[in-house]
Structures are given as C-alpha cells and as structure tokens.
C-alpha cells in the first residue's frame, strides 16, 4: 500500500478506496494510511461472503450491514464515509433506500455494460447492467439502475476489458 500511495502522490491522484468491514477490522492501519494520505474511504459492505450479497439480504439486514461498515470505517479513518460499492456489485431494489437511510450519498455498484454476469453470483439479476446509464446520474429512490431524483448519485465503474467502454 505505501508504494501505491507514493505513486498516487507523485502524480497528484486522489482515489476512493473501498474496504469491507472484515478487511478494515483486520488491517485498520491500511485504512488509516489511505485516509491520512488524503484519499476517500468508501464502504464495501461487511464482507464478501455469498450470503452477505445485497441482492438477497432483506432491507433491515442491509441497513445493519451499512451502519456497521460505515461506523467502523469512520472510527478508523476519522473521516465521514459517504460512498459505497456493493460486494460483487450485488444490489436489490431496497439497496438505494438503505443507502439513503444510512447517510450514503454516492453508490458505485452499477457497472453498465458489464459482461461477466453469466459467470458470477446473482448472474440473472445482473442483466440489468446492460441497460444502466454509463455516466454518473441521480438514482431513483427504489432502483439504482435507473435515473431519478433521489439524493443518491450513481458513479458507474468501468468493468469491461476495454477500460473506457463503461464510462463513455
């Protein structure tokens, strides 16, 4: 991590580092190092366990996982956490509401034009990635995949072999 942070500093790059609660608890010094270098710390949920996928979790459990990871990351970093990326990019219609309720303002879980959905968890549900907007947008309060008027902004990550294809 120090080499990566040095490289980013050399070129004036600021990034968002997404950590699961599990990793943050094991390696708090890594989270703190990124935060102290001026980078944003984002939540990546509680863990990557299959049963912790936001596409299968009930709303109440999503809220608990978000509250847990947000508080842990804020306690370690000393900074407010407002960005989220779902583990394995697995979300449900309830995820947008859960994010808003727990104080998140940015989501980065909808990788438009992602083509690995046949090979990953929740693959049938990921077909929505093919029609999601490719540029940042305000989400619908009940659906991260479509534009709306909520206070949650979706910043789609590029997730194709050609780096620029998911962001143009």
Give, region by region, the residue ranges found by the protein language model.
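Short, electropositive alpha-helical surface patch
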Residues: 25-41, 94-107
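Acidic-and-aromatic substrate-binding clefts and catalytic sites of carbohydrate-active enzymes
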Residues: 16-28, 52-60, 85-93
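Conserved radical SAM core fold
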Residues: 45-53
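A structural signal for the main folded, soluble domain(s) of proteins
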Residues: 3, 8, 46-47, 64, ...
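Active-site beta->alpha N-cap acidic-glycine motif
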Residues: 1-37
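Conserved, mostly hydrophobic/aromatic
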Residues: 8, 17, 44, 69, ...
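An active-site-proximal "capping" alpha-helix that borders the catalytic cofactor pocket
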Residues: 62-73
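Active-site-adjacent pocket scaffolds in enzyme catalytic domains
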Residues: 74, 79-168
């Amino acid at each position: 991590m120090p080499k990566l942070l040095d490289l980013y500093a050399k070129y004036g790059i600021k990034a968002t580092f997404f950590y699961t609660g599990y990793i943050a608890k094991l390696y708090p010094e890594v989270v703190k190092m990124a935060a102290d270098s001026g980078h944003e710390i984002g939540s990546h949920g509680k863990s990557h366990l299959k049963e912790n996928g936001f596409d299968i979790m009930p709303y109440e459990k999503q809220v608990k996982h978000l509250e847990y990871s947000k508080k842990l990351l804020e306690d370690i970093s000393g900074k407010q956490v407002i960005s989220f990326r779902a583990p394995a990019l697995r979300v449900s219609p309830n995820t947008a509401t859960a994010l808003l309720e727990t104080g998140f303002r940015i989501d980065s879980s909808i990788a438009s034009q992602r083509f690995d959905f046949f090979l990953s968890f929740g693959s049938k549900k990921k077909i929505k990635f093919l029609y999601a907007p490719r540029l940042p947008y305000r989400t619908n309060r009940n659906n991260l995949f479509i534009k709306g008027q909520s206070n949650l902004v979706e910043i789609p990550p590029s997730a194709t072999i050609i780096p620029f294809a998911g962001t143009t």
